[in-house]
């Protein structure tokens, strides 16, 4: 659903943007995804989506994934991004938090800023939708999925 306005923080000022093209995912086309999977296609799903008015809008990928978890009954999910996982100290890869209890996600907001806050909110919603295990890992490295599954990132369960 397309948002009519968005608040944006620029330095110390907060601005209201009314001509934005962002929205929030409210449902997933499960039939299309299942059609692709049943015919041995691997769908690559990205943040742009269609609004209720058939406009192309940008969406929050982490929230979209949470909605997909519920719609497709996903048990395990891997999320790759530009960090080694959840860090205690922003930018310090040596401060990686290896394991997080899904029932204690609220305790980890103190370590997040910017996009990581949205990732944590998306993770909370994904677990509320039935997710059992979430891997956060670095997508910039060689063999990122294999390394994520081997525990070279943050595992939330």
Model-derived features: positions:
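C-terminal catalytic "cap/lid" subdomain
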Residues: 1-157
């Amino acid at each position: 659903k397309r948002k009519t306005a968005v608040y944006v923080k620029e330095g110390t000022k907060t601005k209201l943007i009314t001509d934005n093209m962002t929205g929030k995912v409210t449902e997933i086309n499960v039939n299309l995804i299942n059609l692709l999977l049943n015919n041995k296609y691997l769908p690559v799903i990205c943040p742009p989506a269609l609004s209720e008015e058939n406009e192309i809008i940008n969406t929050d990928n982490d929230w979209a994934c949470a909605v997909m978890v519920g719609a497709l009954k996903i048990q395990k999910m891997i999320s790759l991004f530009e960090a080694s996982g959840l860090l205690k100290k922003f930018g310090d890869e040596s401060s990686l938090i290896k394991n997080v209890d899904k029932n204690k996600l609220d305790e980890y907001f103190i370590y997040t800023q910017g996009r990581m806050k949205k990732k944590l909110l998306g993770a909370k919603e994904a677990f509320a939708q039935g997710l059992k295990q979430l891997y956060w890992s670095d997508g910039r490295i060689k063999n990122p999925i294999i390394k994520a599954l081997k525990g070279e990132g943050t595992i939330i369960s």
